[in-house]
């Protein structure tokens, strides 16, 4: 803000992702997953709102297809992303007409680099994705770019970028 004196866009992309079987959920997991996936986007948007309104800007939240179709073993992550999906729609109402608020819901794009996601589960997901492959971070970036720059009459929407995964679930 100091350098350009305006804010045109906010992309809430920070996220934590790890399994939380019901019996293993604790306060630390709650704080991490809810904090990064729901709390941070809310308060960042709140802080940015006056500047975004002045610039007639846009917000894009990165949700997940599992916000609406939960992934077994990840109830806290799914709940946090479902909250972000609801927040996206609520903020579209709150910030209109000056600010557009949308979301992108990635499907199988990136996989954890540790052993927290079973390779056979990953293969099963890809098999049940219409395009039979993972997407790339560039697929998400292009969709975010579209929402920020080429969609002036779109707000309160979620675009699934999932290779057809949700059409096949």
Which sequence ranges carry the predicted segments?
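A conserved structural motif in NAD(P)-dependent oxidoreductases
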Residues: 129-140
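Substrate-binding pocket helix/loop in short-chain dehydrogenase/reductase
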Residues: 21-22, 29-34, 114, 121, ...
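Short, small/polar-rich loop/turn modules that mediate ligand/substrate recognition or access, typified
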Residues: 96-100, 155-156
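Active-site helix of classical SDR
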Residues: 45, 80, 88
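Alpha-helical segment proximal to the catalytic Tyr-Lys
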Residues: 50, 93-97
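Short C-terminal tail/terminal secondary-structure segment
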Residues: 69, 128, 145, 149-169
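Active-site loop-to-helix junction immediately N-terminal to the catalytic Tyr of the SDR YXXXK motif
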Residues: 25, 70-78, 90
């Amino acid at each position: 803000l100091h350098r350009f004196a305006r804010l045109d866009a906010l992309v809430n992309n920070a996220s934590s992702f790890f399994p939380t079987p019901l019996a293993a959920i604790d306060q630390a997991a709650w704080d991490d997953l809810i904090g990064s996936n729901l709390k941070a986007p809310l308060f960042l948007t709140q802080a940015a709102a006056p500047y975004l309104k002045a610039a007639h800007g846009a917000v894009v939240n990165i949700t997940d297809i599992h916000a609406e179709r939960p992934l077994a073993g990840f109830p806290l992550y799914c709940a946090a992303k479902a909250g972000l999906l609801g927040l996206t729609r609520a903020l579209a109402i709150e910030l209109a007409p000056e600010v557009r608020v949308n979301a992108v819901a990635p499907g199988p794009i990136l996989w954890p680099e540790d052993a927290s996601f079973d390779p056979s589960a990953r293969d099963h997901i890809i098999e049940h994705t219409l395009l039979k492959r993972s997407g790339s971070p560039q697929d998400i970036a292009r969709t975010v770019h579209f929402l920020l720059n080429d969609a002036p009459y779109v707000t309160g929407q979620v675009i699934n970028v999932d290779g057809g995964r949700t059409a096949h679930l």
